[in-house]
Regions:
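Long, histidine/aromatic-enriched segments associated with O2/redox biology
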Residues: 1-330
Length: 331
């Protein structure tokens, strides 16, 4: 049996992206289930017009939607985004059944694909649409390079592809998304040296501060985590800036792909609750999370030939106990 084909989670960061989060309207399961299989064809049709634009999309499914769309087992760690409240800072959990992470060299093909996907899905409601852009040399609007710690090569595969721990979903991964809005007035009031202590890296040349100079509540310090054997645990981030000058909106769209949902969740807990508790991420004094959703990113093979819809209780023969419906469900 050939190895499962992952979606393009590890595609290089592009200058343009659209992050589209939708919910499935009541009764829309069949249309959405059918529409998922059409997405690859849409990418080919639109991307064929100009292959140099490197159009791609990664499609991911939320916890509640999974049970509405597919029969059989479900990914072992799939659950709704865990809201966090550390008293001083809060990470909300917001609705989302499907996430479409659309990337290309230019926004025109991203926009065309987003329109086509929503039309193909049919009875869905867009609950969040964010247009991201590359800012100089992959910097965020705070002025720092973003994504420096991303693994590459085999390490990236290991960080983002489920293996024998959940064989039914090998090659897939989990993805967390959050929108952060930045208080640019407060941020720009800091000196460059103060900003560097908040982040844990130098601003101009993107060098990690020495441990002696890096505060325990710096963003970098709280996002470097190890397993029980001392091995650093990695995720792959494809964060992008977004904003609207007229509305005073300046933000970062956080999107983190991981083999284990627990890795990203530990990083977020360190930021919002603190490690130790109370030592929260200093960047949250300037950046506020306004959304939070979690999804599972299946393989391309899964999307091309998904399991059938679950059998609704109203469709079962009279007297059926539906014992088989317990298979693969968390107990």
């Amino acid at each position: 049996m050939p190895a499962p084909l992952p979606q393009q989670v590890l595609a290089p960061l592009t200058p343009a992206a659209i992050f589209l989060v939708v919910t499935i309207d009541p009764g829309g399961e069949q249309a959405v289930h059918d529409g998922l299989g059409d997405i690859a064809g849409l990418v080919r049709a639109i991307g064929f017009r100009d292959p140099s634009k490197h159009l791609s999309v990664v499609t991911s499914i939320g916890s509640a939607a999974w049970d509405r769309l597919f029969s059989g087992p479900r990914p072992a760690q799939l659950h709704p985004f865990i809201a966090l409240d550390g008293g001083r800072h809060r990470a909300p959990s917001t609705p989302g059944d499907l996430l479409f992470h659309i990337c290309a060299e230019t926004m025109d093909v991203c926009f065309e694909l987003a329109m086509r996907i929503v039309a193909a899905m049919g009875p869905v409601t867009v609950v969040d649409e964010t247009h991201g852009f590359k800012f100089f040399d992959n910097r965020d609007l705070l002025g720092f390079v973003d994504g420096t710690e991303n693994p590459d090569g085999p390490l990236a595969d290991s960080a983002t592809q489920i293996g024998v721990e959940d064989p039914d979903f090998a090659g897939g991964c989990y993805v967390h998304v959050q929108k952060y809005l930045h208080d640019m007035t407060a941020w720009n009031a800091l000196s460059t040296e103060e900003q560097e202590r908040v982040i844990g890296r130098t601003k101009l040349d993107d060098i990690e501060l020495d441990d002696a100079a890096k505060p325990a509540n710096s963003h970098l310090a709280l996002n470097v985590i190890d397993d029980d054997e001392g091995n650093e645990l990695k995720i792959v981030r494809h964060n992008m800036p977004f904003g609207q000058i007229g509305r005073g909106e300046f933000g970062t769209y956080f999107i983190g792909y991981s083999r284990s949902a627990a890795v990203t969740e530990r990083m977020l807990s360190n930021m919002f609750i603190g490690s130790p508790p109370g030592t929260t991420d200093h960047i949250l004094e300037f950046s506020t999370a306004i959304t939070g959703s979690m999804f599972f990113t299946p393989t391309q093979d899964f999307l091309d030939d998904p399991p059938p819809l679950p059998v609704r209780s109203s469709d079962r023969p009279t007297g059926s106990l539906a014992i088989g419906s317990l298979k693969g469900q968390p107990q």
